[in-house]
Amino acid sequence: MSKPVLQIENLNKTYMLGKREVPALKGLNLTVNAGEFVAIMGPSGSGKTTLLNIIGAIDKPTTGKVLLDGIDVGKMPENQLYKIRRDKMGFVFQTFNLLPYLSARENVELPMEGRGKTKSEQKKRASELLAMVGLSGRENHRPQRLSAGEQQRVAIARSLANNPAFILADEPTGNLDSQNKQEIIKLLANLNQTQGTTIIMVTHDSQAANHTERMLLLKDGKIIKEKEGLHMAMKNNKCPNCGGSIKTGDEICPICKKPLIAPEEPFSS
């Protein structure tokens, strides 16, 4: 049984708007185990950004516990939180956030500064990560010479630099065209399956979410639904559409007669 890398217990977050209290998260509970790929979905204002900021130790809960690798970050001072962010997490952003004056390799090396690695070790590690995400031969290119999809691959390589406990991905396909969206989500899914990388992803993209193991629907600050993603359903020999039993090699579900692909809207029923 995989151990939890994230445990959230009765999490509440309230903001003050003048003298009025505005609840953003309400009694939320969540456990993510090592090696999981989890998608968090929900409409605007549902609390996704607030939740991601709290998981990422950028914001603090009003009440409740947030345990990252067993450490309660909700009670830690800021001068210790930056070490948690550096050592325990990797971040992937919608807008890539690469430094334009650094090469792809140098962007990946940056999080390793001050972590005890020599410059040659940093360079070797960065080159290995860029090769892993399919960018061999592009490591000396600056961001402006890379496509949007390639820039996001660099960002994913950077997020892995310090072997984090998990990756937080905030709308990682949001600024990409349809082809690059598919390539990036397949890359994340492959990292999860082959490297055991734990990924927590916030997304509006139903097809991206469907490629995860577990999908959570957030509404009004609460998790109101949970569903298996396509990969977990297929792994468990279940149709992703109706949940009926399937066997290896099936292309059509024998129960609902639908193709064995992810439904376009996972929470529509």
Where is each model-derived feature located?
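ABC-family P-loop ATPase nucleotide-binding domain
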Residues: 1-14, 225-234
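ABC family nucleotide-binding domain
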Residues: 4-218
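H-loop (His-switch) and adjacent beta-strand-loop-beta switch element
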Residues: 215-228
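Residues immediately within or flanking Cys/His clusters that coordinate Zn2+
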Residues: 236, 250
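Short cysteine-rich clusters marking metal-coordination/redox-active sites
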Residues: 239, 253
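Cys/His-coordinated zinc-binding microdomains
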Residues: 243, 257
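Short Cys/His-rich micro-motifs in 6-15 aa windows
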Residues: 258-267
